[in-house]
């Protein structure tokens, strides 16, 4: 079996701009993959055009070798755009191999370990009473882990107007999160995604405004470029961090794990769409 083509399909899922790829073979079996770098899908498409020439004629079963070829094929390897492109290819190749062998992908990775994977649901409502109402709806539907977003006063709109006000945000968000915990009790794990909008001081202030048992995880409170910043924040709060959505390589995780900074690596599906399965 040989790879004959790589096709790209930019699409929109809800408000997100996503990129789906299709790798075709000379035996009629094809694989689908996804790039996880939403809103930068055009940049990923540019990288995939480079990689397409390297893929044509390759054996799609040699997934690990292809990953290494793509990653090492140019002097300036790595980075979020290239990692997203490689991950889409990697996922599609596993799809091809699973179809050709007639097995699900997990059989290629050592077999099934469990019958289901725990997930969380995002409330998707503005911070306030609507957030609490949304949480009750999710609990009634059977969810036991929920995530919400932050209060975003004066958020930048589509016209580029407005300025995010962090101090107003942390105060209002913390107040309503404490109320949310009171409302749902211990029936659910609660997390919040701050989309790395805060400084260390702002994130510390936010955590200090929370009750001891309010949050089960705080996702991406600050930028990830310097582990030292997260290390400083780690000393200021007991709240577990969920980190890694911005990472573009497995090596970026190392200092966070070694220093005990993170207790939860970011969503597995997102990591696969950024790094691939072989990674």
Please provide the spans of the model-predicted regions.
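N-terminal amphipathic alpha-helix/helix-capping segment at the start of soluble metabolic enzymes
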Residues: 1-14, 98-99, 103-116
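Structured beta-strand/loop patches that form or line metal/cofactor-binding pockets in enzymes
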Residues: 1-32, 36
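Metal- or metallocofactor-binding catalytic centers and their adjacent structured scaffolds
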Residues: 26-101
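Metal-dependent enolase-superfamily TIM-barrel catalytic cores that perform enediolate-based chemistry
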Residues: 116-236
């Amino acid at each position: 079996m040989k790879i004959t083509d790589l096709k790209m399909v930019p699409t929109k899922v809800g408000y997100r701009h996503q990129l789906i790829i299709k790798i075709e073979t000379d035996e009629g079996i094809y694989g689908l993959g996804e790039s996880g770098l939403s809103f930068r899908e055009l940049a990923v498409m540019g990288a995939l055009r480079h990689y397409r020439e390297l893929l044509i004629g390759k054996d799609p079963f040699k997934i690990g070798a292809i990953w290494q070829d793509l990653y090492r094929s140019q002097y300036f390897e790595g980075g979020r755009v290239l990692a997203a492109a490689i991950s889409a290819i990697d996922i599609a190749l596993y799809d091809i191999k699973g179809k050709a062998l007639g097995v699900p992908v997990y059989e290629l990775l050592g077999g099934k370990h469990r019958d289901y994977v725990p997930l969380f649901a995002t409330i998707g409502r503005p911070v306030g009473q609507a957030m609490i109402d949304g949480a009750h709806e999710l609990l009634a539907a059977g969810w036991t882990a929920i995530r919400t977003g932050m209060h975003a006063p004066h958020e930048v709109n589509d016209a580029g107007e407005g300025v995010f006000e962090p101090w107003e945000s942390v105060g209002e968000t913390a107040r309503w999160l404490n109320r949310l915990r009171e409302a749902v009790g211990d029936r659910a794990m609660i997390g919040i995604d701050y989309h790395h909008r805060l400084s260390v001081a702002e994130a510390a202030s936010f955590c200090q405004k929370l009750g001891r048992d309010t949050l089960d995880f705080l996702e991406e409170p600050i930028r990830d470029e310097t582990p030292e910043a997260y290390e400083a924040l780690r000393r200021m709060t007991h709240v577990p961090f969920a980190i890694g959505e911005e990472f573009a390589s497995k090596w970026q995780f190392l200092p966070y794990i070694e220093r005990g900074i993170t207790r939860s690596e970011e969503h597995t599906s997102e990591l696969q769409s950024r790094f691939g399965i072989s990674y």
